[in-house]
From Swiss-Prot:
UniProt gene name: darP
GO cellular component entries: cytosol
Family the entry assigns: Belongs to the DarP family.
One term of GO molecular function: rRNA binding
Species for this entry: Stenotrophomonas maltophilia (strain R551-3)
Protein name (Swiss-Prot/TrEMBL): Dual-action ribosomal maturation protein DarP
GO biological process, alphabetically ordered: assembly of large subunit precursor of preribosome
């Protein structure tokens, strides 16, 4: 029953303004879902019955028709449980945070690559201080090859390879992952031999 509670004087239901704000939040969430790539969308806990509506909204490009289809998508989304929509929002927030960390890591890898090419062994020593698991000889060879390629105006194969090596080196730390299983096993073996 709508209206006020006779004893407490509080409203029984949400106000129209609150309902409108909730509907606009769902519409904004729908816009985010439509803007995602299929791979990003597959990682989210989106109910199966919403996927065709999202695909249809992506397909329509005419402004007014797109807006109307987006409103239709939001209407279907409002029928979902609040917990489902909250799970989608949480997953979107986690994806955006992971994406920001990956971009920051890539910038760091590019900076290290430029520093390695400019400073040589001095920068390599600093890199090994930060990342002791790095292969010194491999990086030194790649830096030397990249400098030679640049001097001879050859395609920058080693230059790209330095970035790939740095990326694989920095990615676990950027994403907050533990060391690789091989490193953990090596540490466990070393600990077991210390105990004997």
């Amino acid at each position: 029953m709508r209206g006020r509670d006779e004893e407490t004087g509080e409203f029984h239901d949400k106000s129209r303004s609150q309902n409108r704000r909730d509907a606009l939040d769902v519409l904004a969430l729908g816009e985010k879902l439509v803007s995602l790539t299929p791979a990003q969308l597959a990682r989210l806990p989106v109910p199966e019955d919403l996927l065709p509506h999202i695909a249809e909204c992506k397909r329509i490009t005419a402004h007014i028709a797109h807006k109307r289809q987006l409103a239709f998508l939001a209407k279907h989304m409002r029928r979902e449980e609040d917990a489902t929509l909250d799970a989608i929002r949480d997953a979107l927030d986690a994806n955006s945070e992971t994406g920001r960390r990956e971009v920051a890591m890539m910038h760091r890898a590019e900076d290290w690559r430029e520093r390695l090419l400019a400073e040589g062994d001095k920068a390599l020593a600093a890199l090994l201080d930060d990342y002791p698991q790095a292969d010194r000889q491999q990086l030194r060879t790649l830096v030397r090859n990249a400098q030679a390629e640049k001097a001879k105006n050859k395609p920058p194969r080693a230059y790209r390879e330095i970035f790939q090596v740095l990326r694989t080196l920095m990615l676990p730390a950027a994403l907050g992952l533990k060391a690789s299983d091989d490193e953990v096993e090596a540490d466990d073996t070393a600990d077991a031999s210390d105990e004997d």
